[in-house]
């Protein structure tokens, strides 16, 4: 990550090309890229921008999904919305833009790995959206969001994540409940067991999965509900 207090002219032009907007107030871009740990930077850090950007992103994605999936239920739209505004998706956008080359952080943050570093990348994307909103208005922010999210929104697999996570979000949105997993049977020898797990969602029919581990069986059961309810397209139909 860069250690310079502000972007060089070359870096600014490169990043603005990736964003699709030339900032009127150049310091807004610097602000959006500055983590709180980079305390020497006078423009402030991106924490307040992140708060605003999260709301702008949610609005634009909700509108995109509403217009794109005309027959989807509120619960189905909520699941897709949660996928598309997740830290994982925002971090993927950051990686696509190579934002790690421009983010300013303190020495401690530079050492972060895994989920914590993923969150930093995701936060910067949200702060960048806020900076665009402040610099050019909602249409400028929406143009950027569509540039990087529209393709993700219409992927056949709905930008699949963990099946249990997806099912929980759908169950909360549609029924206001949490899925319940039950181990019905464990069979086979210790070196090659088989777990039979049923998942129940109040308001929907249960499904069962059989796998070599309890977690894998839970995933299979969750996937079957998601595919049955049309939240996920069956894998066989995607080929």
From Swiss-Prot:
What PROSITE patterns does this protein map onto?
A: DS_RBD, RNASE_3_1, RNASE_3_2
Q: Which residues form a coiled coil?
A: none
So which domain of life are we looking at? Bacteria
Q: Does the keyword Nuclease apply?
A: yes
Query: Which coenzymes or cofactors are required?
Result: Mg(2+)
Report TM segments. none
Q: Which GO terms describe its cellular component?
A: cytoplasm
EC number(s): the record gives 3.1.26.3
GO BP terms: mRNA processing; regulation of gene expression; rRNA processing; tRNA processing
Keyword Cytoplasm included in the entry's annotation = yes
Question: Which Gene Ontology molecular function entries are recorded, alphabetically?
Answer: double-stranded RNA binding; metal ion binding; ribonuclease III activity; rRNA binding
Which Pfam family is one of this chain's hits? Answer: Ribonucleas_3_3
Q: Any idea which positions bind Mg(2+)? A: 50, 123, 126
**What chemistry does it catalyse, as a reaction equation?**
Endonucleolytic cleavage to 5'-phosphomonoester
Family that this chain belongs to: Belongs to the ribonuclease III family.
Q: Name the chain's protein.
A: Ribonuclease 3
The primary gene name is rnc
